[in-house]
Amino acid sequence: LWHTPNLYLNSKQEKVGKLLGDGYDYLAYFCNSGAEANEAALKLARKATGREKIISFKDSFHGRTFGAMTATGQESIQAGFGSLVPHFSYLTYNYLPDLEQLDETVAAVILELVQGEGGVLPAEKVWIKALSAICHEKGILVIVDEVQTGMGRTGTFYAFEQYPLLPDIVT
């Protein structure tokens, strides 16, 4: 995709935005990078829910800006930069018992449906189904980071289309 400043209407951007949300009740926000998209998703989740806590997963990768780096579940990426953004916790990917930690204090869960830096590890459908149900029940937003898996790279336009999941926010 391409990007021009959001200061004025761009007809091509408008057309692409509509295509990206085609078939879903989604709006598009254009930005410069995957990290910026994830930062916007985290801010939107906190603003929309009024909650601060964000859940991510060990061995995930969401970017190198402060919020996205904090969401990244890898100490090697986070080391050396001082204090991270508060109110982030990390669960074990594809591990059903950890989902019991999701409660009404959580604003959002951010995840990749295929963890690239975690070893090219796809999410298990039973785990996604449970995660989705718990999040829906407790008012937790689901953010799917499609920066590496979207645009047809996994066989469907969005990777989430292969799972029993309709995310609230897609990056």
Labelled PLM ranges:
Residues 1-171:
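Conserved N-terminal phosphate-binding loop of PLP-dependent enzymes in the Aspartate aminotransferase
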